[in-house]
Amino acid sequence: MKKVSRNLLQARQMVDKNRFYSLEEAMELVKKTSYTKFSGSVDLAIRLNLDTRKADQQLRGAVVLPHGTGKSVRVLVATDSSEVAAKSLEAGADLIYSTAELEQNLKIDNFNFDVIVVEPKLMPILGRYGKKLGPKGLMPNPKTGTVSPNPEKAVAEIKKGKANYRADRYGIIHSLIGKTNMEVPQLVENANTLLRLIKRLKPNTVKGNYFKNLTVSASMGPSIKIRFDNL
């Protein structure tokens, strides 16, 4: 613990907590201040002027990042169609389960996957396992593209590097935008892709400043403030 605390202290000393950095400067710092021996995740935290109690201000979805997330994702497609199964495997699916196999595995808590992709007609079956899948973030959702009439397309997008985003009850979106071993321009482009989408999705009922705060951090590193006056 002492070593981790010392590393974190040294990392924090590299960051001026009163300064708002440009996106490029922030991505350079997030790489320098990550003190893990492995490539850590880079997460963007976007605080928005939202009241998520209102239905039209609940932002949730997914975006394909131009340089991917850097994270390997194990994708399961549940289908009883041999054609869908073949296309999904070709698109990069790691597992194919029939509906019977899916239920068998869910009953014994065999969660050997990171994402489930299904066709809309299978959602009533998955709904029975909501208490198991929901807390693990595994329940498919149309907004994130994991409930789709074209599972193979969903698989291809996930494998390409799809990042989910969701505003919490405080109006803050936390999203993975890459790994610390990625180049600064790649992280910047990924961040801009997400930020442009969030800006475009601004609800019409939001008054005043939409963006309230913007920070980036590595999984093991300090939080770095980013300028957002130009968003």
Swiss-Prot record:
What HAMAP family does the annotation carry? Ribosomal_uL1_B
Q: Tell me the Pfam families matching this sequence.
A: Ribosomal_L1
Write down the species: Mesomycoplasma hyopneumoniae (strain 7448) (Mycoplasma hyopneumoniae)
Keywords linked to the UniProt accession: Repressor, Ribonucleoprotein, Ribosomal protein, RNA-binding, rRNA-binding, Translation regulation, tRNA-binding
Q: Which domain of life is it from?
A: Bacteria
State the protein's name: Large ribosomal subunit protein uL1
The yes or no answer to whether the keyword RNA-binding is present is yes
Report which gene this protein is encoded by.
Answer: rplA
Q: Where are the transmembrane segments?
A: none
